[in-house]
Amino acid sequence: MGIPKFFRYISERWPMILQLIEGTQIPEFDNLYLDMNSILHNCTHGNDDDVTKRLTEEEVFAKICTYIDHLFQTIKPKKIFYMAIDGVAPRAKMNQQRARRFRTAMDAEKALKKAIENGDEIPKGEPFDSNSITPGTEFMAKLTKNLQYFIHDKISNDSKWREVQIIFSGHEVPGEGEHKIMNFIRHLKSQKDFNQNTRHCIYGLDADLIMLGLSTHGPHFALLREEVTFGRRNSEKKSLEHQNFYLLHLSLLREYMELEFKEIADEMQFEYNFERILDDFILVMFVIGNDFLPNLPDLHLNKGAFPVLLQTFKEALLHTDGYINEHGKINLKRLGVWLNYLSQFELLNFEKDDIDVEWFNKQLENISLEGERKRQRVGKKLLVKQQKKLIGSIKPWLMEQLQEKLSPDLPDEEIPTLELPKDLDMKDHLEFLKEFAFDLGLFITHSKSKGSYSLKMDLDSINPDETEEEFQNRVNSIRKTIKKYQNAIIVEDKEELETEKTIYNERFERWKHEYYHDKLKFTTDSEEKVRDLAKDYVEGLQWVLYYYYRGCPSWSWYYPHHYAPRISDLAKGLDQDIEFDLSKPFTPFQQLMAVLPERSKNLIPPAFRPLMYDEQSPIHDFYPAEVQLDKNGKTADWEAVVLISFVDEKRLIEAMQPYLRKLSPEEKTRNQFGKDLIYSFNPQVDNLYKSPLGGIFSDIEHNHCVEKEYITIPLDSSEIRYGLLPNAKLGAEMLAGFPTLLSLPFTSSLEYNETMVFQQPSKQQSMVLQITDIYKTNNVTLEDFSKRHLNKVIYTRWPYLRESKLVSLTDGKTIYEYQESNDKKKFGFITKPAETQDKKLFNSLKNSMLRMYAKQKAVKIGPMEAIATVFPVTGLVRDSDGGYIKTFSPTPDYYPLQLVVESVVNEDERYKERGPIPIEEEFPLNSKVIFLGDYAYGGETTIDGYSSDRRLKITVEKKFLDSEPTIGKERLQMDHQAVKYYPSYIVSKNMHLHPLFLSKITSKFMITDATGKHINVGIPVKFEARHQKVLGYARRNPRGWEYSNLTLNLLKEYRQTFPDFFFRLSKVGNDIPVLEDLFPDTSTKDAMNLLDGIKQWLKYVSSKFIAVSLESDSLTKTSIAAVEDHIMKYAANIEGHERKQLAKVPREAVLNPRSSFALLRSQKFDLGDRVVYIQDSGKVPIFSKGTVVGYTTLSSSLSIQVLFDHEIVAGNNFGGRLRTNRGLGLDASFLLNITNRQFIYHSKASKKALEKKKQSNNRNNNTKTAHKTPSKQQSEEKLRKERAHDLLNFIKKDTNEKNSESVDNKSMGSQKDSKPAKKVLLKRPAQKSSENVQVDLANFEKAPLDNPTVAGSIFNAVANQYSDGIGSNLNIPTPPHPMNVVGGPIPGANDVADVGLPYNIPPGFMTHPNGLHPLHPHQMPYPNMNGMSIPPPAPHGFGQPISFPPPPPMTNVSDQGSRIVVNEKESQDLKKFINGKQHSNGSTIGGETKNSRKGEIKPSSGTNSTECQSPKSQSNAADRDNKKDEST
């Protein structure tokens, strides 16, 4: 089955089955199952197409362990954790494995040859062969040992792993991983005490898992997988902590599917049972192909196979006497009914594919299916002459009977009857007469005694209470039906139709003949071969169905053909009795020899290798050097049929037998079968567990894990429990967190909705849901609803219901909200009229919600009369009494009222408030907690006992060192000095670029090339619509975008490298320009060559760009290396710790790791902060300390990049930025910030000490203030104002633009804050004067942040981190030119500055203190901090038609001598002046304004920077245009 296509198709047809995992907003699961080969694929196939990047086995093992732990921490299973690696597969699967591995080896060899031809540097040593992921290889044996070590480590050290049952099925246990999982679930389900509402989650990438999950009939079942993207693949792979994961909920899939079949429920001839329909659907889907059988011809998902299968299956259900799938056994007779309907699809394909289609349509239109469809579209019938004549004789009689209503109580002999002519050949016309009579409300009677047929009025079909109007409508309908028959297409006689049918059938047989001849090398003349082929395929359907429902029926059976029979021939294989011989699986080495190509011979034992390459080998023909591929109607290369021979089992075993004695003892062990293993925690066990990888993993000094064999007894088919078990909860009664459509009423229909689930609108039908507004139906007013639910919990985010607190309700005219106040009169429910802004927000939300629900979810919510504002629940926090209360997000969500659910059947236990629990239960004796006191904030603490029922006795550990290392903060300051940011209007002014052009060229600037394709020729450093930036190149604060000196250099490089193109691009308007219009005098070839050079240059420029959210930031690569170097020395010199015992400690002075998630998520972090990991579960040992080197927002959570003091098993090197594996990205809720101590608890003693310190500081401040005289303050203020006016007048005189307008002090607003004025330094032109002019910035108007959220806090942290300081040189050396970019290397290219991360460090900036070698860019965890060098110029390939002046030199801020301090309050005229200069100083040439003076750039100082701003009209227009470009 085409995995991505099937997943995409069902996701677009049933749009809401996918749920993005966001923190804890997913259901709880009892059991988690891992199809481990999906993980192996992700961890080893990351760079399949790039032979220049290689992974060592040690790196692969570490990545696999990290991936497993990440999935465990994501789902957090409560009972069972089952890991299954593919063992030896059944022969039915082995043929597919053989084809795939031969194809993989061929592709790898081609990729290597291509890289060598391109001159790419190939790493030394053998590359990792992905074919080693096959049972029996050395790699798999090592993997098993490493995974066993990993399990022992996690159970010994991780509390969460100890609480569940761990079962591991390695490669030495026969069977595919996914089917081992299904066998395990079958055993669970068949136990008498099995809970039918067990919550299952399977991780895996195979689409077959969807069918396997459905076959269990478990409603609480979900599939976990990574985010799927379609279209062009991104070369940069996300790090694990930034990888999005989705849950595909089978509960919703089941409900959507039931909507598909509800239309036939009342028409079926037997009892409707959705669970049985589901079983039949699974069988039906086998014919589009799977791992064991090829798809039936022309049945391709991307060519409309799915709706065909559904529709033909529905038709078959209406015309058969029961279900096809009888608990895993196929009812072949009923299967034949469905195949008969499916054959109509084949006839349609034949009619489309016939060579002479035009002749076919004209000559055979009367009997072809396509001709019948055309007649149906225009309402035409096809009749022979005699049939039309017969209608003419019936019509007068019928019209006479319809002159008046007939009584429904007429005796039978009085019912109007018309005897048909006796000479009528009823054999030829009986079927036609039946259809005609049914359409006209008649029925046919036959008198055997008279030998005649008659038409009789069907009075039973007439409503006995029919009104006169209804009678007339019936008469008119009959008249129209007769007219349709009389206007039919007429054929002379039946012989003519028979002749056409004969021609049709002959051409159809010829069409099938060509298929069998081309694909299977025999023809339809070989009737026996066609029948054998059909029997093999039907046998295969039964094998697969047994495999799904009962387990492997035969290890040796396989389908011995590469292609399937034609659908119409499949019925020839139904007449058989199907039995299977169980046999036994291949040994691991037999499978290796059966599936591996000769190119992978190093993966098998040396003794067997000659059998592959020796020409005298009896099985040499099993290993061809090349294999043919046949796409067979598919579009993707990987879907092609690999035409490789099938392995003869007998020949293979006989050839290997003589070499078995040459195997080493280790190889003999690898060739044996093993057992599943079960692991458990036993505190009494305490021993040493040796590490299989001493250089990567350390020994487990205190191993508390017990390992045993896990043995299950195979089930007989009679012991298996099929279908949905009794008392399983469905629909609105499902367990908390599991989604259901049925919590709201709706109607459904299939529509071409262009649903946008992925990146493009769907071309297929989607199930569209029309919501019924129950509140409107029940006449519930907004006031009634508000009084009942305001400030209380309701449920939103349907169908994924989540608890939320209703805070307000509005219809756009009136707002209903809850008011809290100490005044009882003002407390409670209130109403107020909506203001203008409220009305705008309401209309905006209304329009966006209608559009979003309709297009993304295929939900039509109807008229939106009210919108609910809610705060979603985030968790529980402990109050001062020890009880737990709900916490809600401070960020509001908005939902249409009709999608709000008032209550649910099963509440989520995770969010139930509870009172205080006994202190000894909350803090068990000897348990570990975190100390929050001033003495050792974040220190490891042990519970020793209880002073009272509310106070603790504890022992706190504190390191001997007095303070935490500050290297992170020190390096942060250095980074701030290296990279300076400038507001967009300053960059625009300095580079003489229009603001709108600057905005587009630094984001997405689309042009149309000669082929009509849209090409982005912008440097993508900012993404307004996506709320993202490129780290180190751009940032956004509340007042607009700012660019770093690195971006300025790129823009200059762009203009210098492609001056003519840059100039012409700067002159276009808002429309997307066409390349030919930009260069009308240039040949298309030369213009396209130029564009190719630009594309290569831009690709090189942006190859290491890291797009992150606006709230993200990181230290540079050099600084991270310096922090690591310092921390390694620091950690090595820590000399022990001291312990202090404390008594009468209140609960709030300690933090319980198991219940602190919601509290810790509210923390703020900054670069350089010291943190401590405080969870007793996860990837890091509890109480591990580290330094924050980066952070980014992930959806609604905050991910912190931490460089830990010690190496950790699950750690990484941040993509090469670290020398050791001590880096990791973690959710903020796992960490406690010990630099910014936000939860510190002060005892009475510490409070007194703190108060004394404050008093001392106040006295010092008062002393300093007393020395200042008011007169001096006034004189300084006067001087600042005078200098500001001098500066403004000076600039005006300098440009000959005299303007007497006074400075408007009020235009910038006033600053009521009492904080000292911010200072910004500007430099006056040296040739005029060196006098410093000082202007106060106290009255700068701050733009408030929109949301008081964690993201907003981090935004502040990012924006404020660049403090005022010395600027850096803007001229950064150019790195060497890549070999594949037009233009070649340039002189002096080796003089490159040290590569920083994620940007270059300018000359003079301090590099690594120990003189480490330059760090090369690598792939790394998000945000990726790769070195980003400025690329070299590339010639455009043809002459420059217009002279282009060189750009003006940039001001070197670092060389500024005297500095000008600008008063922002006095600078509004300066802003107006700059704006006027931008627009009125004449036309521009090549992006440079005529008559303009060379500009200077002043660095920005973060969010609160005080540089002048261009008028809002310019910046807003630029941002709007940029946003529009991004959405194009």
UniProtKB/Swiss-Prot annotation:
Disruption phenotype: Mutations affect nuclear fusion, lead to reduced chromosome stability and defects in spindle pole body duplication and/or separation as well as loss of viability under conditions of nitrogen starvation. Homozygous diploids are unable to sporulate. Mutations also lead to arrest in pachytene and deficiency in meiotic recombination and sensitivity to oleate. This is 5'-3' exoribonuclease 1. InterPro entries: 5_3_exoribonuclease (IPR027073), 5_3_exoribonuclease_1 (IPR016494), Rib_uL2_dom2 (IPR014722), SH3_12 (IPR041385), XRN1_D1 (IPR040992), XRN1_D1_sf (IPR047007), XRN1_D2_D3 (IPR041106), Xrn1_helical (IPR041412). Gene3D superfamilies: 1.25.40.1050, 2.170.260.40, 2.30.30.30, 2.30.30.750, 3.30.1370.250, 3.40.50.12390, 6.10.140.950. It is found in: Cytoplasm; Cytoplasm, Perinuclear region; Cytoplasm, P-body. Pfam families: SH3_12 (PF18129), XRN1_D1 (PF18332), XRN1_D2_D3 (PF18334), XRN_M (PF17846), XRN_N (PF03159). The modification Phosphoserine is found at S1510. Residues 1274-1304, 1518-1528 have a biased composition (Basic and acidic residues).
